């Protein structure tokens, strides 16, 4: 079942997710080959442009002001600083430059500066993405005017489990922002995190929510939790690699046209596990040594692995 614009049911997705592993991989990889070059990856870079002191209480996040973590508060970077980082990202092979700020929602006074960042990064020939928290319709329109290509706003987990992870906002708040972004004509980047203490049923409901959006996200980041000392989820049980691959494969089947990004947690993955993820349908990664505040595989390690697998940069 890979029909586009299909409204999926929980039982549909359970049947896909829980089928024998080899059958799941075969189905996912067949669909992946139909819609994408199986030997190419999209390279993106993620920069924290405003770090720490976020008023939200996401139980996994190093940047929450509710917890004492290794992260130090840093003010919003200047346009010049951001553009220098964007130039370095382009030189390192990135095609998309993502800018993240630890806000509940961006202050209106910051919008002109954010628009300058977007315009400057686009002038370098890079695609632009931002993740700034919740957006109003007006703010989304301003970012679109500046030329923003993608906006990231993850739903994190299933609607049923969401309030076990975050209490300072509602799941519906996430959907409202996604609707504002979509209405403004900006492409949607939306995914979640595995390893928050959720069940397999939660992961299936999470995928159902994404796949049944009126227009599924153009980009779907799948993160494996990086436990952060000082946060409530610091001791969360690690999701097994096979479960990660099942989630990616199912996402590929449900959302055949979307880019599936293997995001946080790659530093803890073996080459073999990453290879399975790419075979299952992941076709986008963040390159560079940092993902906001956490470590990412060093460039030379990525280059070595991608060469072994015959994976090249997406045109």
Curated annotation (Swiss-Prot):
Positions of disulphide bridges: none
Cofactor(s), names only, from the UniProt record: [4Fe-4S] cluster; [2Fe-2S] cluster
GO molecular function per UniProt: 2 iron, 2 sulfur cluster binding; 4 iron, 4 sulfur cluster binding; biotin synthase activity; iron ion binding
Binding positions for [2Fe-2S] cluster per the UniProt entry: 98, 129, 189, 261
Catalytic activity: (4R,5S)-dethiobiotin + (sulfur carrier)-SH + 2 reduced [2Fe-2S]-[ferredoxin] + 2 S-adenosyl-L-methionine = (sulfur carrier)-H + biotin + 2 5'-deoxyadenosine + 2 L-methionine + 2 oxidized [2Fe-2S]-[ferredoxin]
UniProt cross-references to Gene3D superfamilies, sorted A to Z: Aldolase class I
Residues that coordinate or bind [4Fe-4S] cluster: 54, 58, 61
EC number: 2.8.1.6
Radical SAM core domain ranges (all copies): 39-266
Family, similarity comment: Belongs to the radical SAM superfamily. Biotin synthase family.
Protein name: Biotin synthase
Organism annotation: Legionella pneumophila (strain Corby)
Gene: bioB
């Amino acid at each position: 079942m890979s029909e586009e614009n299909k409204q999926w049911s929980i039982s549909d997705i359970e049947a896909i997710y829980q089928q024998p592993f080899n059958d799941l991989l075969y189905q996912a990889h067949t669909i992946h080959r139909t819609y994408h070059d199986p030997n190419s990856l999209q390279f993106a870079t993620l920069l924290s442009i405003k770090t720490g002191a976020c008023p939200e209480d996401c139980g996994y996040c190093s940047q929450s002001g509710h917890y004492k973590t290794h992260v130090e508060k840093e003010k919003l970077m200047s346009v010049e600083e951001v553009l220098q980082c964007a130039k370095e990202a382009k030189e390192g092979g990135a095609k998309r430059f993502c800018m993240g700020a630890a806000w509940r929602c961006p202050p209106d006074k910051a919008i002109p500066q954010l628009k300058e960042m977007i315009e400057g990064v686009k002038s370098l020939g890079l695609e632009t993405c931002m993740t700034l928290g919740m957006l109003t319709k007006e703010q989304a329109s301003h970012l679109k005017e500046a030329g923003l290509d993608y906006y990231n706003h993850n739903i994190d987990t299933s609607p049923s489990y969401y309030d076990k992870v975050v209490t300072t906002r509602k799941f519906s708040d996430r959907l409202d922002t996604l609707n504002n972004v979509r209405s403004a004509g900006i492409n949607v980047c939306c995914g979640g995190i595995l390893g928050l203490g959720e069940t397999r049923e939660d992961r299936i409901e999470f995928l159902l929510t994404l796949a049944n959006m009126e227009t599924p996200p153009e980009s779907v980041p799948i993160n494996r939790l990086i436990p952060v000392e000082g946060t409530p989820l610091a001791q969360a049980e690690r999701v097994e690699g096979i479960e990660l691959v099942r989630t990616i494969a199912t996402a590929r089947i449900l959302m055949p046209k979307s880019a599936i990004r293997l995001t946080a947690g790659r530093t803890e993955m073996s080459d073999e596990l990453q290879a399975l993820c790419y075979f299952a349908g992941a076709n986008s990664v963040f390159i560079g040594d940092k993902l906001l505040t956490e470590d990412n595989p060093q460039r030379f390690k990525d280059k070595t692995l991608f060469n072994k697998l015959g994976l090249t940069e997406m045109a």
